[in-house]
């Protein structure tokens, strides 16, 4: 898995013909954050920020996942979404 493949996938996901389902978007978001930042390094958003909490929780579930594993899962998911939604 190369950084270039990961960056290409990050650009391609922005060009999908249809917006992926919320669960798919959470997968993409959380794996991108784990690959680029690592483990969660912020406080969990407040109780009124439902979207923020969902994103934080999805990212936090990946705690301990290596950058390489997160990048691979991200690229694989983007490839799946490209087949499903088109680009």
Curated annotation (Swiss-Prot):
Gene3D superfamilies linked: 1.20.80.10
Presence of keyword Plastid: no
Assembly information from the UniProt record: Monomer.
CDD domains per UniProt: ACBP (cd00435)
Protein family according to the UniProt entry: Belongs to the ACBP family.
Domain ACB as annotated: residue spans: 2-87
Organism lineage string: Eukaryota, Metazoa, Chordata, Craniata, Vertebrata
Cellular component GO terms, alphabetical: endoplasmic reticulum; Golgi apparatus; mitochondrion; protein-lipid complex
Modified residues (Phosphotyrosine): 29
Residue list for modification N6-malonyllysine: 55
UniProt modified residues of type N6-(2-hydroxyisobutyryl)lysine: 55
UniProt keyword annotation of Translocase present: no
Disulfide partners: none
Annotated keywords: Acetylation, Endoplasmic reticulum, Golgi apparatus, Hydroxylation, Lipid-binding, Phosphoprotein, Transport
Protein name per UniProt: Acyl-CoA-binding protein
N6-succinyllysine modification, residue list: 8, 17, 55, 77
Ranges that cross the membrane: none
GO biological process: fatty acid metabolic process; phosphatidylcholine acyl-chain remodeling; positive regulation of phospholipid transport
Modified residues (N6-acetyllysine): 8, 19, 51, 55, 77
